[in-house]
Amino acid sequence: MEKLGMVVSTFNHEITGEMSRRAIERAKEAGAKIVKVIEVPGSFEIPLAVKELLEQKDINGVVTIGTILKGGTDHDMVIAHAIAKKLMDLSCEYGKPVSLGISGPNITWQQAEKRIEEYAARAVDSVVKMLRKG
């Protein structure tokens, strides 16, 4: 059974909390287990917590959960691109899969709500599939 870590942004907790619950359910359905969850204030802080989990020998991969809503500036775009690049870099550096379960940028609250199930499932599925490849 694959042992996964999960990092959850608590910003927009009404959305990310539900995404987190659904991700845990999806992992069980897939025959994997989320063994450690780290909550962080916002999506910007996700990469540091991911690194902490990747350094643990008993963690096979990491699921990330967050949502970045559209604001009045391009801040959401800048943050989303920086996070995606850093997560990809960490995955390659540690040789363990890291998912991008962060909805956004450039989405509204309503759009984020509609994506809860899909993004939570994809976040788990991508890590599990990478661990089971070959």
PLM feature segments, named:
Residues 48-86:
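Glycine-rich phosphate-binding loop
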Residues 36-44, 104:
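Short beta->alpha junction loops
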Residues 79-104, 122:
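Short, acidic/small-residue loops that bind anionic groups at enzyme active sites
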Residues 105-118:
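Phosphate-binding/catalytic loops
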Residues 8, 64-68, 99-103:
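Short beta-strand segments
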